[in-house]
C-alpha cells in the first residue's frame, strides 16, 4: 500500500481519535494529543459528510467540555486548525476556544 504523507497523517489522526473516543466512553479524561486528534477527526469527518466550514467552526465548540479533558488542557487548546477536503476543494477550518 502506497500512501501520500497527507494520507498517512489522516490515518494517524484516525487512530488517535479512535483511542480518544474509547477513553471517553470509559469515562477517562483526554490528554493533549488525544484532544487534538479527537477535534481534528470530527472536522475531517464533518467535511466528508458535506458540512460547511462555518458549520464545523460552530459545532466544534460543542464537541468537548472541560469535564472531558485533563486539567490545563482547555487553556492549552485555544484554537485548532486543520485542512479538510470539502466537495469544492481543500479548506482550512479554525475552531476558536473548542473546549467549553
UniProtKB/Swiss-Prot annotation:
The protein's annotated pathway: Nitrogen metabolism; urea degradation; CO(2) and NH(3) from urea (urease route): step 1/1
EC number: 3.5.1.5
Keywords, sorted A to Z: Cytoplasm, Hydrolase
Subcellular locations according to the entry: Cytoplasm
InterPro entries the UniProt entry points to: Urease_gamma, Urease_gamma/gamma-beta_su, Urease_gamma_sf, Urease_subunit
Domain of life: Bacteria
The protein's enzyme class: hydrolase
Signal peptide: none
Family annotation (Pfam families): Urease_gamma
The keyword ATP-binding belongs to this UniProt entry's keyword annotation: no
Reactions the enzyme catalyzes: urea + 2 H2O + H(+) = hydrogencarbonate + 2 NH4(+)
GO molecular-function terms, A-Z: nickel cation binding; urease activity
Recorded GO CC terms: cytoplasm
GO process annotations (BP): urea catabolic process
Broad class of the protein's primary localization: cytoplasm
Subunit structure as annotated in this protein's UniProt entry: Heterotrimer of UreA (gamma), UreB (beta) and UreC (alpha) subunits. Three heterotrimers associate to form the active enzyme.
Similarity field: Belongs to the urease gamma subunit family.
Record's protein name: Urease subunit gamma
Species name: Prochlorococcus marinus (strain AS9601)
Amino acid at each position: 500500500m502506497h500512501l501520500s504523507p497527507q494520507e498517512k497523517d489522516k490515518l494517524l489522526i484516525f487512530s488517535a481519535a479512535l483511542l480518544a473516543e474509547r477513553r471517553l466512553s470509559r469515562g477517562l479524561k483526554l490528554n493533549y494529543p488525544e484532544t487534538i486528534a479527537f477535534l481534528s477527526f470530527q472536522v475531517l469527518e464533518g467535511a466528508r459528510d458535506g458540512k460547511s466550514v462555518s458549520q464545523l467552526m460552530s459545532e466544534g465548540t460543542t464537541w468537548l467540555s472541560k469535564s472531558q479533558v485533563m486539567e490545563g488542557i482547555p487553556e492549552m487548546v485555544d484554537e485548532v486548525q486543520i485542512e479538510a477536503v470539502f466537495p469544492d476543494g481543500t479548506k482550512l477550518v479554525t475552531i476558536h476556544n473548542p473546549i467549553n
